Curated annotation (Swiss-Prot):
Record family assignment: Belongs to the AAA ATPase family.
Region (Docks into pockets in the proteasome alpha-ring): 598-599
Record's comment describing the protein's domains: Consists of three main regions, an N-terminal coiled-coil domain that binds to protein Pup and functions as a docking station, an interdomain involved in ARC hexamerization, and a C-terminal ATPase domain of the AAA type.
Protein name: Proteasome-associated ATPase
Coiled coil: 21-97
Gene Ontology CC annotations of this record: proteasome complex
Record-linked SMART domains: AAA
Annotated stretches, region: Disordered: 1-22
Encoding gene, per UniProt annotation: arc
NCBIfam families: pup_AAA
GO molecular function, one term: ATP hydrolysis activity
Protein species of origin: Actinosynnema mirum (strain ATCC 29888 / DSM 43827 / JCM 3225 / NBRC 14064 / NCIMB 13271 / NRRL B-12336 / IMRU 3971 / 101)
UniProt pathway annotation: Protein degradation; proteasomal Pup-dependent pathway
This protein's record includes keyword Metal-binding: no
């Protein structure tokens, strides 16, 4: 052992130093690896942290937005609450204010004060600076505060008493203009009132109805008189002379009386001929009296518009349509007042050079013979009122009175004399030729006709219509037992048989055609065969005659005869002669014999 290798000790020391260096390196390597792992872990965790931060930032931003929106809503709510508080405060202040009074403005003065009428007194008050005194007009309402200061201008009064204007007084009012008028109020009480500003610019005539505040003493506006305004036919009737059948002679007479003086006024002046003042249309009911009056209004309106160069579509007729019973009033003098208003309105329109027609329908109801009244004597004052209007001291120029009546014998003779109702036109019941003309107005070739009837006339609608009219008229006017209607006994013992043709009228013919058309419609619905046929017209005649059997009752058959158009000897007895009326159904015919059953 002592002889070991030399240098062995130094080798061991070298190995030890090499081993420690190796351990340090290993430790350093491990440390570095740990550092690398830490760095790698941090590098891996860094995006996750960034995302977390971004998420927190987004949440914070969203919360800020929510808080901002909430803050905005709170601001709006506070602003609205503040506005409501201010409104409530204003409402409380307004409710706490004392009440305001109203007055009527009368006049203004240079010192800025004004006169008003309030609480039944005339007072001079001051005006608020916010009110322009120059804008206030006479009669205007003004609002006053508790100190009686004018704080606001208002409108004109719209309610009050209706008074009639008697006359306008030509003296200066507070504003230096015509401002006073004499009016008549309730119970003919007269008073002088101021005219408000709206009335100063409008023409006023005696008789106008004015709205009056009797306490303030002002008239504010003109009130339309419905009782007269409603009488004017602003819309022209659509009835022409061509639409009237069977009355060509009567139409010519009334055109000569009404239209000729207007169309050829120069010739009338040259021949010193005054146009007639009135026309009486009389005759049985349903024969066209009112129809002619409508045609006169239509024709006259077109003639006036043509003379003025206006479009006929804009034509207006000055046609005062007066229904007789409509004028009657239980108060004494009211009917006469209405008549005066009617003719006053007619004179106003006629003064413009336009012809005016005053049409009295059922004239016998109000202008009957004086002294003939049983329960009243209203005609003793109504008739003189009409007479004085037609040819009194105040003449009627360009005004024509047309009366219609089926009892002309009851009209006062003073009205019917020449110079008043000059022209008297009898509207008679249509004869056979007149009936054909009337049928032609209702049966036209554009109506659907039955195939059998068309075939009979070779398919010509015009010839078919003409044949149907011919057959119908022959059936109505033939003197057969089927057409016998009544046997009348006169006071002298004579008897006369009256046929249905003696009671025919234009209204009856129209009714027959309407019945036939309705039967044609029912036949179409039942049998599917369209068209109007002669058979429908024949059945319509039978039905119409059957209805005329049962006439209203009267105790005086002579009165019925006068209305129906039969004049002459007094009738004392009437008996029906209706036989064979509805042979198809075998209906029994009742023959009534009690006197006066038929009116």
């Amino acid at each position: 052992m002592p002889h070991g290798h030399p240098g062995s000790q130094p080798d061991e020391g070298g190995e030890l130093s090499n081993g420690s260096s190796s351990g340090e390196l290993t430790a350093q390597i491990r440390f570095l690896e740990d550092e690398i792992a830490l760095l790698r872990r941090k590098l891996t965790e860094s995006p996750r942290h960034a995302r977390l931060l971004e998420q927190r930032l987004a949440e914070a931003t969203e919360r800020v937005n929510q808080l901002t929106e909430r803050n905005t809503k709170l601001i709006d709510t506070l602003r609205e609450a503040r506005g409501q508080l201010l409104a409530l405060r204003e409402e409380v202040d307004r409710l706490a204010q004392p009440p305001s009074g109203y007055g009527v403005f009368l006049a203004r003065f240079e010192d800025g004060t004004v006169d008003v009428f309030t609480s039944g007194r005339r007072m001079r008050v001051s005006v608020s600076p916010s009110v322009e005194t120059s804008s206030l007009v006479m009669g205007q309402s003004v609002r006053l505060n508790e100190a009686l200061t004018v704080v606001e201008g208002g409108d004109f009064e719209r309610t009050g008493e209706v008074c009639a204007l008697r006359e306008v007084l030509d003296d200066g009012g507070p504003e230096g203009s015509v401002a006073r008028a004499l009016v008549v109020g309730h119970a003919d009480e007269e008073r002088v009132v101021w005219l408000a500003q709206p009335l100063l610019d409008s023409p006023l005539k005696a008789g106008d109805s004015l709205l009056v505040d009797s306490k303030a003493g002002f008239a504010y506006e003109r009130v339309p008189k419905a009782e007269v305004e409603d009488l004017v036919l602003e819309e022209v009737p659509d009835v022409r002379y061509e639409d009237i059948g069977g009355l060509s002679r009567q139409i010519e007479q009334i055109r000569d009386a009404v239209e000729l003086p207007f169309l050829h006024a120069d010739l009338f002046r040259e021949y010193k001929l005054r146009p007639p003042k009135g026309v009486l249309l009389y005759g049985p009911p349903g024969c066209g009296k009112t129809l002619i009056a409508k045609a006169v209004a239509n024709s006259l309106a077109k003639q006036v518009s043509k003379a003025r160069g206006e479009d006929h579509k804009d034509a207006k007729s000055f046609f005062l349509n007066i229904k007789g019973p409509e004028l009657l009033n239980k108060f004494v003098g009211e009917t006469e007042r209405h008549i005066r208003l009617i003719f006053q309105r007619a004179r106003e329109k006629a003064s413009e050079g336009t012809p005016v027609i005053v049409f009295f329908d059922e004239m016998d109801s109000i202008f009957r013979t004086r002294g003939s009244g049983v329960s009243s004597d209203v005609e003793t004052t109504i008739v003189p009122q009409l007479l004085s209007e037609i040819d009194g001291v105040e003449g009627l120029e360009n005004v024509i009175v047309i009366g219609a009546s089926n009892r002309e014998d009851m009209i006062d003779p003073a009205i019917l004399r020449p110079g008043r109702l000059d022209v008297k036109i009898k509207i008679e019941r249509p004869d056979a030729e007149g009936a054909k003309d009337i049928f032609a107005k209702y049966l036209t070739d554009d109506l659907p006709l039955h195939a059998d009837d068309l075939t009979e006339f070779g398919g010509d609608p015009a010839a078919c219509i003409q044949g149907m009219v011919q057959h119908t008229v022959e059936r109505m006017y033939e003197e057969t037992d089927e057409n016998r209607f009544l046997e009348v006994t006169y006071a002298n013992g004579d008897k006369e048989v009256l046929y249905f043709r003696d009671f025919n009228s234009g209204a009856m013919i129209q009714n027959i055609v309407d019945r036939a058309k309705k039967s044609a419609i029912k036949s179409l619905l039942d049998t599917k065969q369209p068209g109007l046929s002669v058979r429908h017209l024949m059945d319509a005649i039978v039905d119409e005659f059957a209805e005329n059997e049962d006439l209203p009752n009267t105790t005086n058959p002579d009165d019925w005869a006068r209305i129906s158009g039969k004049k002459g000897e007094r009738i004392v007895y009437i008996r029906t002669l209706v036989t064979g009326k509805n042979q198809e159904t075998g209906r029994a015919i009742d023959t009534a014999t009690n006197t006066g059953q038929y009116l």
